[in-house]
């Protein structure tokens, strides 16, 4: 977990200031949530079978034997706060937050167990306009920070119904090739089969490339939504690459998902729509999108 020294903080503060100006220009408001939340919040919203919850969270029991966890991401806490304070009922909201997150991962270049993230969330908005806004806004951030060696990848996970149908098709496909799956993929097969598509095992690359494609299982609503998003990005000159193997490791993603990385190797930003999350927490307010980096 890194320490930020005075000389480094000057650069950090400059970057943060530039980001805040752009977020403010799009009418996003700051929200601050606790570093600690009840573990069950992340289990319900992120998904108990995800790698984040099952392997990567820092969790402990307090003096009342209540399980608490350091936040591994920001969205769950923002949703909880919005529902508890009635911020989503019959209204739209745009929030941003900034701060440290924690995951017990293997430390490596560019990846730390404490990492800092900027999070943008929009609630109560329907249609692809809000997805386009988040991507265009993020593109402005990269441009203003003089970061241009980046690659934006896009995919659509569709509605919760189309995702469920695709999941069943995927399980059937991989069961027919079960002898070719590695240990991690065998564990994911029943619990989170879409994560197999994200495997870095080169020996499984051909098998994954031949797997059923999500695009072939999208309903018409999802197809229209995604195509509209692409047209909006094209009109704003946003470059992207379609990646049908792109999935997110958290259960609450539906609709368009994106993954932005430096062409070298790092991953500064990812985003996706989170319709399922409010349902799991019991809140209303329609669709929404969000991103963090």
Which sequence ranges carry the predicted segments?
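TRNA-recognition modules of translation machinery and tRNA-sensing kinases, especially anticodon-binding
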Residues: 1-263, 280-282, 293
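Single conserved hydrophobic/aromatic residue that forms the stacking wall/gate
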Residues: 261, 268-293
């Amino acid at each position: 977990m890194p320490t930020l020294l005075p000389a480094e903080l000057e650069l950090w503060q400059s970057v943060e200031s530039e980001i805040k100006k752009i977020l403010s220009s799009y009418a996003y408001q700051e929200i601050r949530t606790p570093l600690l939340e009840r573990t069950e919040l992340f289990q319900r919203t992120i998904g108990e079978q995800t790698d984040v919850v099952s392997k990567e969270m820092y969790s402990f029991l307090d003096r009342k034997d209540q399980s608490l966890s350091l936040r591994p991401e920001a969205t769950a806490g923002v949703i909880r706060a919005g529902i508890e304070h009635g911020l989503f009922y019959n209204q739209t909201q745009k929030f941003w937050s900034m701060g440290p997150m924690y995951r017990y991962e293997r430390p490596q270049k560019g990846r730390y167990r404490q990492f800092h993230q900027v999070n943008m969330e929009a609630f109560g908005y329907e249609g692809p306009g809000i997805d386009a806004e988040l991507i265009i806004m993020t593109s402005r951030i990269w441009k203003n920070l003089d970061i241009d060696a980046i690659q934006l990848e896009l995919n659509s996970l569709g509605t919760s119904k189309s995702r469920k149908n695709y999941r069943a098709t995927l399980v059937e496909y991989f069961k027919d090739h079960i002898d070719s799956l590695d240990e991690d993929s065998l564990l994911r097969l029943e619990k989170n089969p879409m994560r197999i598509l994200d495997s870095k095992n080169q020996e499984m690359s051909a098998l994954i490339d031949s797997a059923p494609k999500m695009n072939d299982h999208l309903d018409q609503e999802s197809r229209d939504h995604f195509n509209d998003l692409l047209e909006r990005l094209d009109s704003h000159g946003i470059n992207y690459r379609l990646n049908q193997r792109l999935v997110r490791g958290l259960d609450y993603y539906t609709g368009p998902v994106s993954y932005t990385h430096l062409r070298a190797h790092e991953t500064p930003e990812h985003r996706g729509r989170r319709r399922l999350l409010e349902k799991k927490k019991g809140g209303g307010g329609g669709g929404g999108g969000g991103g963090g980096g």
